Design a protein with these regions (language model features):
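Short, basic/hydrophobic alpha-helical segments
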Residues: 741-760
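Long amphipathic alpha-helical coiled-coil/heptad-repeat bundle
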Residues: 2-529
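Electropositive nucleic-acid engagement tracts
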Residues: 611-612, 629-688
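Short, conserved catalytic/metal-binding motifs centered on acidic residues
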Residues: 66, 636, 689-695, 745, ...
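Structured, charged N-terminal subsegments at the starts of enzyme catalytic cores
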Residues: 530-639
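Active-site cores of enzymes that catalyze phosphoryl transfer or operate on phosphate-rich substrates
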Residues: 674-741
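A short acidic (Asp/Glu
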Residues: 71-73, 647-650, 659-660, 699-702, ...
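C-terminal catalytic or substrate-handling cores of phosphate/nucleotide-
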Residues: 751, 756, 770, 774-838
Length: 838
């Protein structure tokens, strides 16, 4: 393979750091250059004094990092000076450089002392390539494979080979893996799918490539139609696409990476080889299919709930207006009643004629309303809601029905009849007549029968369709599942296979390193119950102390009342001290941070094979500042000498969630190494983190943007969940403003890839749920939420009594159901181990 085809893995600075002599401090010199008896004997066996010193230095370097070096004398003269002054006291030596043969002889002794082998392509190359091929199935990123190669060499006691050697091997592994997948697709793919992919790339098919990449930005019918178009065009290809990708055994990370290539190349995808086109498009089709299905489901749920809420609002307003109108029509009702005593009316007249005169005074509906008013009754809100649904026939037959027909439902024990009814409804609506003809009356409650059945007991089929739609949203919490959509599928789909769990349960528990999960439930529950009783007693004792300043127990009238003390504001928002510090530009701060951490190097090119030079350093800084200040690259281009096209290209090449996360970890890891970091700990040797959501108004509509009058007024926005430890933002996730923050607390902790691992986590009330207490405890975290209304929480959870000596006694109001925990302990273990493996 030509050198130009080798992937660029390390930057020049990283190459110098790995393949150059390490920079030892005085403490490092004392540690790495100390010799045992065997090492000292071999060093003294060399006749040339300079080579003895060089052996000690290279041996110390090899202990620090197992790399074969051939440094110049002036590069290591300080370490040589330390050796002949401290380790092997002597007169020193004149400047010299080792010849290749002398270097090889010295390293033979180093390998002997360290029990290592020199890298040899013939002996070790094939085994390393096989190992990297296995690793590539999980993640083909060159840096990941490079780290895996270093780890393999360390485990096999092999000196790290030259950078060019690893470049060549990794390039070959990546190339062979893609060639293998392309060859498999050539053999296994049907001719029809090959033609469809070719038409997609060339733009000659019924679905243009540009239209495939377009996705819905909100829940309007126009936007959701984009997802429906994609669904209709690729639906019949998806079984074969899923089968092909399953035979390739691609990891989720690899599949996502390959799918992103389609967005990166865009119309330029046709310049790639046919095999690469197939691979990228198949991965993209599966990802796009999942996205389309999820948005179709979200859109269906949104419109059903919105219609139900609008129907409720309409019904309440209609009933109120009807009541007001009835009150105004009481006088006209008197005229209707007067007809029965009017002497001018012939008694022989048919009642129909009199009735017609009455209806000329008041309509039938108004007359009914007056009757209800006189009886102090109101029209049923439910009736008005169904009348509203009757008026929304176009929505039901149009958008909702199209979305509904794209979904496949499965039920559990309590929803099998509903799932069967939904499937039957879909079959009938997909038929030639496209009409719903049958209904399962077993699903109707006694209350709903009044509005879904006519006077003769026949079901109102249009209302029945609405009834089915309204049953779906609230049952997607596990009662009903959508097996084709990750977000709505059954819990078992995300757990370890049941058969595999039964056979390998104890092995999996040991590999998870969860001490609590491996214990017997009865023993664990007894131990935790004792700890809880002890803790409740200690809290009671603490509250009795006179110097307790953290919580107020009684008010002046003697009534028990729990609240936090309100602290007065003694500090200024803008302390005058900070006015003495000179102002520094954000770009200068970023340059300083990059100088100390090198985080810019984390922004690798999306293709991986590009040079890792720093020629785009200033452009990346401009992009980061522009996006962070919500100005975007367009706003940055307007106020700088960078063009929009230039910034847009660099952003597409370098700025991704993966690289942004790596850069953030780089800065956080460097921060954690600073001596001052531990002084921010609230408790000694304990990292106390917090998680909370910040609300940001969004300029563009996406599927995550939601209305929230409290935070955005009439606009839409998102919530940015951030995990903070000692003022370092170690992880973040953007969620919808309508989503509960507590659902993402565990995910923030588990997806944290930095070296800062929290011990304690605090959230506000919005981050609390019962599951988080159990999960975080099982995974070794301490959950310590901070409640806004602490008095209400204490009164809801605890009974506070006093014994004969008037000492406080705390106990739970609702006892913990330990029997249920023990009964479902196997399921709890399976869920926890499954989460650990994610």
């Amino acid at each position: 393979m030509a050198f130009e085809e080798r992937v660029q893995i390390l930057s020049e600075a990283e190459q110098d750091e790995l393949y150059g002599p390490p920079a030892f401090t005085s403490a490092d010199q004392r540690f790495f250059f100390s010799l045992n008896d065997k090492e000292l004997a071999i060093a003294k066996s060399l006749r040339h004094r300079g080579q003895r010193y060089m052996l000690v230095v290279l041996l110390g370097y090899f202990k620090a990092k197992p790399v074969v070096l051939n440094p110049g004398f002036h590069q290591i003269k300080q370490d040589l000076k330390y050796v002949y002054q401290t380790v092997l006291p002597g007169p020193g030596c004149r400047p010299f450089n080792l010849t290749p043969k002398e270097n090889e002889r010295i390293y033979q002794r180093v390998f002997q002392l360290c029990n290592y082998q020199r890298w040899n392509v013939k002996d070790h190359g094939a085994a390393l390539r096989d190992y990297l091929s296995q690793q590539a199935r999980a993640w083909t990123a060159p840096r990941h494979l490079f780290d895996a190669a270093i780890e393999y060499c360390s485990g096999q006691k092999i000196a790290i080979p030259a950078y060019s050697t690893l470049q060549k091997i990794i390039s070959q592994v990546v190339g062979d893996e893609q060639e293998h997948m392309a060859a498999h697709l050539e053999r296994a793919m049907s001719r029809g799918l090959k033609q469809a992919l070719a038409e997609l790339v060339n733009g000659t098919g019924p679905l243009p490539f540009r239209q495939l990449r377009q996705s819905a930005r909100n829940f309007t019918g126009t936007e959701l139609e984009k997802e429906l178009i994609v669904y209709r065009h690729i639906q019949h290809w998806m079984p074969e696409v899923d089968l092909l990708l399953s035979t390739l055994s691609l990891s989720q990370k690899n599949l996502q990476h390959l799918a992103e290539k389609v967005d990166y190349y865009g119309a330029k995808l046709k310049r790639q080889t046919v095999g690469s086109q197939w691979l990228y498009l198949l991965c993209y089709l599966q990802t796009r299919w999942q996205q389309a299905l999820e948005r179709i489901a979200d859109g269906f749920v949104h419109h059903v709930r919105q219609t139900k809420q609008k129907a409720k609002d309409y019904a309440q307003e209609a009933v109120f207006k009807d009541w007001q109108k009835a009150a105004k029509n009481v006088s006209k009702a008197a005229e209707v009643l007067h007809l029965f005593i009017d002497d001018s009316i012939d008694l022989q007249l048919p009642f129909a004629t009199v009735r017609q005169q009455a209806l000329s005074l008041l309509t039938k509906r108004d007359l009914e309303s007056v009757c209800l008013f006189l009886n102090e009754q109101r029209r049923s809100v439910d009736e008005a809601m169904w009348q509203y649904c009757d008026e929304k026939e176009s929505l039901r037959k149009g958008l909702l029905r199209e979305l509904f027909l794209c979904l496949r439902f499965e039920g559990c024990d309590g929803t099998q009849h509903l799932a069967a009814a939904l499937a039957k409804t879909q079959n009938e609506l997909n038929g030639q007549d496209a009409q719903l003809q049958t209904a399962d009356t077993r699903l109707l409650s006694k209350k709903s029968r009044e509005f879904l059945l006519d006077g003769e007991g026949n079901i109102l089929i249009d209302r029945y369709e609405w009834f089915l739609y309204q049953q779906i949203p609230d049952r997607l919490n596990g009662q009903l599942t959508l097996p084709d959509i990750t977000k709505y599928r059954a819990l078992d789909a995300d757990l370890i296979d049941g058969e595999h769990w039964r056979k390998n349960k104890y092995t999996l528990l040991q590999q998870s390193h969860f001490t609590k999960l491996a214990e017997e439930p009865e023993k664990l529950i007894k131990q935790m119950a004792m700890e809880l009783d002890t803790r409740l007693y200690e809290v009671g004792e603490y509250l009795e102390q006179e110097d307790n300043r953290n919580i107020i127990l009684r008010n002046p009238q003697g009534k028990r009342f729990w609240r936090l003390p309100s602290a007065s504001k003694h500090h200024l928002v803008n302390n005058p001290f900070f006015q003495q510090i000179p102002t520094t530009g954000i770009a200068d701060v970023l340059r300083m941070v990059d100088r100390d951490t090198g985080f810019i190097d984390c922004f690798a090119h999306v293709l991986g094979s590009q040079s890792r030079s720093r020629s785009h350093e200033y452009d990346l800084l401009a992009i980061l500042v522009g996006n962070a200040t919500n100005q975007g690259i367009y706003g940055m281009a307007q106020i700088s000498d960078r063009t929009y096209d230039q910034l847009s290209t660099i952003q597409a090449n370098y700025l991704r969630l993966e690289t942004l996360n790596a850069a953030n970890d780089n800065i956080n890891n460097a921060t954690a190494k600073l001596p001052i970091f531990r002084y921010y700990n609230i408790q000694e040797d304990v990292i106390h983190a917090s998680a909370d959501g910040q609300k940001f108004e969004a300029r563009r509509e996406t599927f995550k943007t939601r209305y929230s009058s409290k935070y955005f007024g009439t606009q839409k926005g998102v919530s940015a969940m951030t995990l903070i430890a000692n003022h370092a933002a170690i992880n973040a996730r953007v969620i919808g403003a309508n989503e509960h923050e507590s659902h993402y607390i565990f995910d923030l902790l588990m997806s944290n890839t930095s070296d800062i691992i929290p011990d304690v986590l605090s959230t506000d009330t919005h981050g609390v749920n019962h599951v988080n207490f159990a999960l975080l405890d099982l995974f070794g975290y301490q959950f310590a939420p901070r409640y806004a209304q602490v008095g209400k929480v204490i009164n809801d959870m605890f009974d506070v009594k006093e014994d004969k000596e008037h000492r406080i006694q705390l106990c739970l109001k609702k006892p913990i159901n330990t029997h249920r925990i023990a009964q479902h302990w196997d399921t709890i273990q399976r869920i926890a181990v499954s989460l650990k493996q994610r």
